[in-house]
Structure formats: C-alpha cells, structure tokens
C-alpha cells in the first residue's frame, strides 16, 4: 500500500495515524518474523513522515491565517503536554 503525499487531497491523516498505531501494537507483541518486522517498520517510517509533513503544512496554514488577521502577529502553539495545571 502506497502512502499518498500528505499535500494531496486524498491523504487521510486520521487513517494514517490509526494504521501507524496498529503497526506499533503488532510490533510490540513481538510475534512477527524479522522480515515482517522490517516491512512493518518501513511502513511505519513512511506513515510517520507523511503525518509529520501534514502537521507541518497545517501549522503553516494556521500561521498564515493568523498573520492575515487585523493585528498580524505570530502566536506560538501551546503544547498541551507542557501546560501548567
């Protein structure tokens, strides 16, 4: 199965992420042969790169939209994992 370019309209981020999670689960169980593990790992790398590219493109789009606002200033994204509670 080929990974479509994350810039194309046919890329489904959620489906790619779900597939990646499934790959990780199968590999963590340790029941795969070495060859199958390598194939799964390679697919995981492809999915990870495509998802990262899609996220970067989304971030750029958000920054562009924010920049088009009346006060046109850049706002940093807050990482919920590092938020003070």
From Swiss-Prot:
One of its GO terms (molecular function) is exodeoxyribonuclease VII activity. One of its GO terms (biological process) is DNA catabolic process. InterPro entries: Exonuc_VII_S, Exonuc_VII_ssu_sf. The keyword Glycosyltransferase does not apply. It catalyses: Exonucleolytic cleavage in either 5'- to 3'- or 3'- to 5'-direction to yield nucleoside 5'-phosphates. The keyword Nuclease applies. It is found in: Cytoplasm. It comes from the Bacteria. Transmembrane segments: none annotated. Pfam families: Exonuc_VII_S. One of its GO terms (cellular component) is cytosol. Keywords: Cytoplasm, Exonuclease, Hydrolase, Nuclease. Its EC number is 3.1.11.6. Belongs to the XseB family. Heterooligomer composed of large and small subunits. Bidirectionally degrades single-stranded DNA into large acid-insoluble oligonucleotides, which are then degraded further into small acid-soluble oligonucleotides. This is Exodeoxyribonuclease 7 small subunit. The lineage of its organism: Bacteria, Pseudomonadati, Pseudomonadota, Gammaproteobacteria, Chromatiales.
């Amino acid at each position: 199965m080929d990974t479509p370019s994350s810039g194309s309209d046919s890329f489904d981020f959620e489906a790619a992420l779900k597939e990646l999670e499934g790959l990780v689960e199968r590999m963590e169980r340790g029941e795969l042969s070495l060859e199958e593990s390598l194939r799964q790992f390679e697919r995981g790398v492809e999915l990870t790169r495509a998802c990262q590219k899609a996220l970067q493109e989304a971030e750029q789009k958000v920054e562009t939209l924010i920049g088009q606002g009346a006060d046109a200033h850049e706002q940093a994204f807050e990482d919920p994992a590092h938020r003070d509670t």
